[in-house]
Amino acid sequence: MSTNQQQQANPSAAVAAPAASSEYLKRTCLICGCHTNQTINIYEPRSGPNIVQLIQAKFKFQPLNEDKFLCFSCNNWLINWHSLQAVNSNEAESQSQSPSHMGNSVLQQERTKLRPVAMVRPTVRVQPQSQPQLQPQVPINPTPAPIVYSKRRASRRSASVSRMSRVLRQCCVESLRRSPKKRNQQSVFVCLRPQGQKRSNAICKVECVAPRRKPVERLVKDVAATATPTPVLNTQSTPTYQRFPQPSVDGKVVAMFRRLGTTLSREEPAAYSAESNPACSKLPQIMSPLKEAPRWTRDLDDDEILLEFDTAISEVLPTARYQVTHEENKENQQAQEMELELEEEEEVDGRAELEVVQEAEAPLEPQSHHKQGNSHQNSHQASIQLAGLRLPMGLSISLV
């Protein structure tokens, strides 16, 4: 649809906005919804696939209004999608509904029907089939076939007999060496010759004795010999399969914590465990070069970091130095009272003992009450601050 037709269809819009302005020429894309002046009407006749049918096949709806537009990118995307569908389904280029394209396709089909291409193909196919049919019909001399076949058989049999003769020679010679006294009792005469020859042409003649009970005795001895050193092997192989714990943190994670101001250190093992297991006392370091197999079974995701809290992570935080307890409060109060008493005794050396006692007891009561209140407030604040931190076992935070 041209701009003149659009102005006739919408005369009010044409009057309101100037004809040369770009805002008037901007249209909304049916697929992506962008507002641009580079649009194409979907009902315009064109060569290639029908855009309306492509929209219906891809998005399962058919635009009924003629004032529907597509931007250039969506138009190209639809055409590319259609070509990919045609390639995947082994089809030719799609036929549009335009009369020119339809006429061209009909003419091409008629031309292909008129071409006498199929008349030549059967002659080419018949020729190779006639050649192998003539080959079995030609008779070949039947007499040499069994002769060649018999020679091959004889050669194969002679090869097999030679192999068997070698095996029997070795077995019989060993048996003759091991049991010379029992030749007369259990003797076996073996004569090997190729088939179809005289008796004089024998390959070998071996007289041997078949040992019946010796293999069983050998097996018993072998089993006893293999059974005795098994505990020695087990005792030697136990330290080889000893597995040390996996380094808890990767080197990259350690470097990351160092840049953030966090230092990682492993806690020293207990003395009794080191004495009991001297081999296990020395654990591998965190950044250990030994890359052993992981002990955990589940594979870690990309955004997961495994932290085993058998190490101490010390961080510098601006909070209280230590946790306040009731016993420490009592000890601090007693020390402060003793210091105050000593100072007051030095000031009032010239006074009598009764006056010193009265003067020392009077200021002690409000100060002790005041200091007790301050210590309770400090301990309460510290407990409130530390109550929010739920630390796992093995994690210690040193507060400075």
From Swiss-Prot:
Residues 125-145, 346-382 are annotated as: Disordered. Induction: Activated by the Ras1/MAPK pathway in R1, R6 and R7 cells in the eye. Down-regulated by the Notch pathway. One of its GO terms (molecular function) is ubiquitin-like ligase-substrate adaptor activity. InterPro entries: Znf_AD (IPR012934). Residues 319-362 form a coiled coil. Disulfide bonds: none annotated. It is found in: Nucleus. Signal peptide: none annotated. Essential adapter component of E3 ubiquitin ligase complexes; involved in R7 photoreceptor cell differentiation, embryonic nervous system, external sensory organ development and specification of particular muscles. E3 ubiquitin ligase complexes mediate ubiquitination and subsequent proteasomal degradation of target proteins. Required for specification of R7 photoreceptor cell fate in the eye by participating in the ubiquitination and subsequent proteasomal degradation of Tramtrack (ttk), a general inhibitor of photoreceptor differentiation. This is Protein phyllopod. The gene is phyl.
